[in-house]
Amino acid sequence: MKTSRLPIAIQQAVMRRLREKLAQANLKLGRNYPEPKLSYTQRGTSAGTAWLESYEIRLNPVLLLENSEAFIEEVVPHELAHLLVWKHFGRVAPHGKEWKWMMESVLGVPARRTHQFELQSVRRNTFPYRCKCQEHQLTVRRHNRVVRGEAVYRCVHCGEQLIAK
């Protein structure tokens, strides 16, 4: 388990939650799925990722430190569910009906696709864009795609194309 200056108490809480939910899933599914590898190497605005082939969960140490309780309650089971779905059903839609079932019926956790954590500390440079109704901040990656002509982004509220300020 790789660490990134995380207090041992937080690492232990993550492991407790992971083992608790894994045991719960194994009991409900009548299986004996192994404990996944766990690392704290996720970067950027993603709270975590599940790597199917290596059976690994990567967690974002910055977001974990800033949102410990909610992170442990929500993100750890979320990523575990991806691995369990892959083991149980094979390759399916990432947040499809199998994942939702695993989250709600097996793990007993609300099936939320995205986190609501404050991202200021992990967000890199953004670029201002406008539509009819508001200003938007595009990431460097999205901005570069617009500049290269590879993408066009629209406002989810008014449907207008976003234009650089």
Swiss-Prot record:
Cofactor remark from the record: Binds 1 zinc ion.
GO molecular function, one term: zinc ion binding
Location in the cell: Cytoplasm
Cofactor(s) listed: Zn(2+)
InterPro entries named among the record's database cross-references: SprT-like_domain, SprT_Zn_ribbon, Uncharacterised_SprT
Keywords per UniProt: Cytoplasm, Metal-binding, Zinc
CC annotations in GO: cytoplasm
Residues that hold Zn(2+) according to the record: H78, H82
Domain SprT-like: 20-162
Stored HAMAP family: SprT
Name of protein: Protein SprT
Species name: Escherichia coli (strain SMS-3-5 / SECEC)
Name of the coding gene: sprT
